[in-house]
Each structure stands twice: as C-alpha cells, then as structure tokens.
Amino acid sequence: MASPLSSSTVVSHRLFFLHPSPLNRKFLFVKPKLPFNRTNSGDFRMRLHSTSSKTGTKELIHSCNSSIDSKLNTFEAGSKNLEKLVATILIFVQVWSPLPLFGLDSAYISPAEAVLYSPDTKVPRTGELALRRAIPANPSMKIIQASLEDISYLLRIPQRKPYGTMESNVKKALKVAIDDKDKILASIPVDLKDKGSELYTTLIDGKGGLQALITSIKKQDPDKVSLGLAASLDTVADLELLQASGLSFLLPQQYLNYPRLAGRGTVEITIEKADGSTFSAEAGGDQRKSATVQIVIDGYSAPLTAGNFAKLVTSGAYDGAKLNTVNQAVITEDGSGKVESVSVPLEVMPSGQFEPLYRTPLSVQDGELPVLPLSVYGAVAMAHSENSEEYSSPYQFFFYLYDKRNSGLGGLSFDEGQFSVFGYTIAGKDILGQIKTGDIIKSAKLIEGQDRLSLPVQNNNINEST
C-alpha cells in the first residue's frame, strides 16, 4: 500500500511528522547562560550523584563537597569578571555597529524552525485564498487582488479598525482596474470577451464591486465591508480564471504521456456511513446517512496530479472505496490493484516560481513555501508511493485535517512541502471531521472541468515500476 499508509490501519512516519520534537523546541528563545551558578550548584551535585555507584555514593559526595564548593567559588568569581568583560564588549560594539544587536535568540533557531515558528510566515489560511493566489493571471489583476486581500487582515483588528487604510487600498485597486482596462480585457480569449466585459463592469460598478466597497468602508460597518470584500474578490477570481485559459508553462518531455488537467475542475464526493449512524445535521437540516463534499482540483499548480485524480474519478475508481481515519487525515484505502493506474511524480509548485518541481520536495529549511500549502483544513493531497517518496501513490489520496495546535507558530504543518497537494475542500468541510474508519465513498463525480482534462491515447512510455 502506498505511503502514508503501509496498511489499512498502519500509518507511515511521513504523516506523523506533525508534532514538533522537544529537541526542536528547546532551542527556541534560549538565552546564553553559564553552565551553572550558585543557585544550581546543588543540581550539579545531584547530577554527580545520579552517575555514581550505589555503594560509593555517600563517600563520593562527602569527599567532593569541599572541593566542589571551592572550585565553584573560584569559577563564579571568574565568571563575574567574564560577564563584565562581555558586557563591556557588547556595549562598545552596540555603539559602533550600524546594526542593532537585539534578537540574538534567532541565532539559536535553525532556518527550518525560523520558518515553521515565525508568526509572520505568510501562507494562505483558507482553500479559497490558496486557490485564488494560484491562478496565473494578468499582473494588473494580481495587484488588484493583493490590495483587496490586505483588507482582510485589517478587518481582523479588534478595535479602531484602520478604515482610512482600507479605503486607500480599494482606491488603489480601482485606479489600477480603470487605468489597465485594456490590458485586463486583452488577456481574455476572444470567445470569452463578452463574459469578461460583464465581469469587469461588475467589478467596477456592480453591487459587490469596488465603488460599493468604498461606500461600505466610509460607513465603517465591518460586516458590510466583509461581505463587499468577499464579493469583490470573487469577481476578481472569476476574471482571473478567464485570463488563465491553460497552463502557463510547458510540461517536461518525459511527462507528456501522463493525464493532465489544464486548469480547474470540481469533484463532488458522496460519503456514506458504514455503521448505520448519521452525519450531524447543519443548522435547520436533517440527520442523514450520507453527505457530500466538493473539492476544487487545481491543474494550474499540479497538472499531472490533478489530471490523474480526475481520470480516476471519471472512470469510477473511487466508487465504493473505504476510508480510514488517521492522525489529522482521512485517507482512502489502497485500491491501486483494482484499477489501471501509474505512479505520478511528486509535484509541488514553489511560491514565486512559474512551474512545479518534480520528484523533489520543497526545502522549508531554505524558506521554500508551496503555492498550494498542506497547512489548510480540507487540503487534498496524494499519499506517497509505497516504493519511493519521489512519487505519489497512483490511487490513494487524503483529506488533511489541519490543526494549528499541532503546527509551528507560523502555522505550518511539519510535513509542509512533502506531498503533492492538488486541491481543497470548498463545501462540506464540516463533514470531514465526522468521517470514521470504514465509511465509504458512495460516488465521486467530476462535475466541472471535463473539457480541461487531457487523456493521452498511449501510456506505453510511462514508467510503471514506481
């Protein structure tokens, strides 16, 4: 069976790197200090006691006490002089150095921990945000998008919200939209021009457009601002999707015979309880034995992985598949022997890059972050191949149940960049936490994106040995 599961109930170590090691944590915010001083000289003796034999413990302590005390006094006297000397040197350097010397604790944090533990680590916190940022759209639209997304952070300020800054952001976005109208519409294919023009008008003057958003901000109504902002960002995303009519990069020659998805697709998965129980009802809803989740799969960032998954869905490969719940994930059983499939290379798009990396995980130690992060509740990714972590499983996928409590202060999963994430749950996320081992995928359907799915006629050149 493919990793992260080595059997239906045993999970590979890859999926359990979710808790920071005590060895990793203990170096965070550690200040330099002397090995021991007067307050811990007793501790030193206790450590010495713990290493002595049972028969000679008392004699050893008695014989060493006087020697230790004298040496401690000598050491402490010298250490105080040393501390004064170090303090003098630091003051001298502080005065003459152009750089401040605060934040010395960062020297004790490895590059990986600096990213994982930094509260300023900027990764999308929702699937919708990650998917919107992943669209390879016109630069003007990206400027508009960034200006509006900044308002989302400003709205989180509990008191004295900076409405003036919010208004400036919207006006900046509006100016770019008006000044670059021709560039924005020129990026849209001819057959979609009419729809693009309609969306552009909505963005400027529509009910959920930028002008209306400025009005809401002037009224200083945070609820209306939030609703208007969401509507404007949805319109921005719709325009960007029209501009991104296909892949913005060429696939490597060796992967041209793989199924691929050149854009977005939507998959609807119906899950059925196996033990006769029911899913908890939503507000005003009824108890039900089956529930539906929708996921958006992203071929812009993971065309091979999303394409292979879409192919399996359309062939009915997941219909009737059993689900297993493991630590922070819901994963399908291994069904690679039941369907014709091949292992797809590990595929991760680094943030700021124009094409994915293949068979190479991201190095968080070097500050690399993925366009589609795993650290989002409801992220959908392929498990590893049972033969090599450079490849994804040909069949097994999992829903990642992200929990901030099991992540670094920066909100990153400790497995970030190690799996091929290819989509996010956009509807039915409340269902994921209710799934139990043994529940069944009743059906999986590709309800949108069939026209973007390419299925090569011949797959003879695909290496199936992985």
From Swiss-Prot:
Q: Which reactions are catalysed by this chain?
A: [protein]-peptidylproline (omega=180) = [protein]-peptidylproline (omega=0)
Q: Does the keyword Thylakoid feature in the UniProt annotation?
A: yes
Tissue-by-tissue expression: Aerial parts.
Q: Which GO terms describe its molecular function?
A: peptidyl-prolyl cis-trans isomerase activity
Q: Which residues form a coiled coil?
A: none
Q: Which UniProt keywords apply?
A: Chloroplast, Isomerase, Plastid, Rotamase, Thylakoid, Transit peptide
Does the keyword section mention Isomerase?
A: yes
Extent of the transit peptide:
1-65, 66-114
Annotated GO CC locations: chloroplast; chloroplast thylakoid; chloroplast thylakoid lumen; chloroplast thylakoid membrane; cytosol; thylakoid; thylakoid lumen
Q: Any transmembrane segments, and where?
A: none
The protein's location, in the record's own words, is: Plastid, Chloroplast thylakoid lumen
Q: By its UniProt entry, which InterPro entries does this protein fall under?
A: Cyclophilin-like_dom_sf (IPR029000), Cyclophilin-type_PPIase_dom (IPR002130), CYP37-like (IPR044259), CYP38_PsbQ-like (IPR048563), PsbQ-like_dom_sf (IPR023222)
Segments forming domain PPIase cyclophilin-type: 278-466
Output the Pfam families linked to this UniProt entry: CYP38_PsbQ-like (PF21329), Pro_isomerase (PF00160)
**Which EC number(s) does the record attach to this protein?**
5.2.1.8
Top-rank taxon, per record: Eukaryota
User: Gene3D superfamilies attached here?
Assistant: Cyclophilin-like, Oxygen-evolving enhancer protein 3 (PsbQ), four-helix up-down bundle
Briefly describe its induction.
Up-regulated by light. Down-regulated by dark.
According to its UniProt entry, the function of this protein is described as: PPIases accelerate the folding of proteins. It catalyzes the cis-trans isomerization of proline imidic peptide bonds in oligopeptides.
Which PANTHER family does the annotation name? PEPTIDYL-PROLYL CIS-TRANS ISOMERASE CYP37, CHLOROPLASTIC (PTHR47318:SF1)
User: Can you say what this protein is called?
Assistant: Peptidyl-prolyl cis-trans isomerase CYP37, chloroplastic
